[in-house]
Amino acid sequence: MGKVPFNDPTVEELLQITEEGLRKYLDPAVETVLTVGNYIVGGGGKRLRPLLLLLFAKGLGVPQTILLEKTLPLAVGIEYIHTASLLHDDVVDEAETRRGKEAAHRIFGNGVAVLTGDYMYANALYLYALYGNQKMIEVVSQAVKLMAEGQVLELKKVGELIDEGTYFQIIDGKTSALFAASTAVGALAAQQENWQIYWDFGLKLGRAFQLIDDALDYEGDEKQVGKPIGQDLKEGKTTYPLLSVLENLNLEEVKKVLSSPNGDGYKKIVLLVKELGGVEKTKERARGELQAAREILNKVPLNGEVKRMLNQILDFVVERTY
């Protein structure tokens, strides 16, 4: 459940200043908001999104002093947005745990969790108003819109057997959009006008990240993943491992499981999906997205050291077990 596991001094430094920034810029006047904020921020996380933002900015030439003074708050803002989405998602999903700990809403209540999430969103936009520019605000706001749309679409499709197009529409919104904003803002911080290509990189990385998340839901270690195996299917959600082997399954049985949340029928489907190769097919699709991301990396003017680190991150995304 921890951060990106690299023994690279540059990555370690960027992760360290991110942690310091997350504490520094979380300064609400109401103690309860601070308590909940510290609980969720202190609960761990990979910090991939802020790391990507800082790496792109650094690799495209942002000086260290500017990186610390003006770019770091933008990276922190991205992580606040991610944190806010987790607070809200756990309330919507009635989740019991998050990152191996009891979900915030179960400790502090739904109302406090939701409103703290609202504060985190507002604080992120405040940081962008102070340290960013108009285009950055547009990019991040668009990502938040897409996140909300993806979450609503997923919620409306619970209990239904969706097609592949709808699946990618959901994950491009709920997951990929914030990765895309992270890499695009990093490029914008370095005065790159063609920010869309950096958005596309983040989008493909985000797709791969969610695909692996969905694979881990079928075969991961519960302690490492931080939630029970088969949880998505149990909640009535169709994800790629299931879609990839659907032609070999009894559709009526699958539909019955999806439409009966929290029953026990999902366990049989989880085993069948694994036996039919659904997990490996999902990982293969993720590798395809990452290959497309690598091709983008080869086209952009990043320095060699940062390009190497980003390729390591792409390796981590597909090989991770949490």
State what each model feature region is.
Residues 1-322:
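All-alpha prenyltransferase/terpene-synthase fold signal
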